[in-house]
């Protein structure tokens, strides 16, 4: 069997579809190398003294783990000098990071959640890195936060690396979703799943059931119907899955189908949701749609949302298309009910 590594895949995609110019290819290769370095630190765990809290907080008001800080630094250092980027933005940093003047600047913007699911680090559950690539609107000019304010439909690439039993890089450049597994013996990501597709129907849902009392009625309605099983209106039994790591939950959905929900709840009614639009929802929505699924905030396609700020939050419903459409329909029906 012919082994295709990430570099070869990117070169052949450019030849066939003209979607990956050299600068974007180099950027994606650097991100992949950074993910390899993060994977190495994650795998060492307690042996390298990288578990536990860093004793600091991020802009989200969350306690940073040591590996959060390490992963953020790895991505910044790996990408700042290559000449492919104008700026970067991270879930862990309050403002964007403009490429220092001593380095050449490129035409892309990189956004990332350096270590998603970090509450799972110390208990050895799968975590990951999520990233999104945008064009710099005004190449050659000074970067402002407004340059990042592009809807998810403008992404030129998105992906994640999941650090589990294997380290897997999942990538889209707008021409389907492809998975690459890290071969540690040779140190390269090898194409192992081409053109991944999410089944349109499912019997699995992923949601934090402990928050049920705080949900809006459309979400309660959907979950109640799932829990009713064969005796309820859906006429089939559902299983619940919840890992508390978006990367791990979405990876399962890309692999075998399902629906992932992190809805608005009434504990913080002024916030549209919990997950970050730019670092989590947009790249995952791009991947899910490219795999034949759907992604909404309950009412609107996530990729159509116009961002207003870098750390904007959003409700997320994504996965198997028919289930996402049903949840969206319930939200729209609730709005129309007097």
From Swiss-Prot:
Homotetramer. It comes from Ralstonia pickettii (strain 12J). InterPro entries: FBPase_C_dom (IPR044015), FBPase_class-1 (IPR000146), FBPase_N (IPR033391), FBPtase (IPR028343). Signal peptide: none annotated. Belongs to the FBPase class 1 family. The gene is fbp. One of its GO terms (biological process) is fructose 6-phosphate metabolic process. This is Fructose-1,6-bisphosphatase class 1. Coiled coil: none annotated.
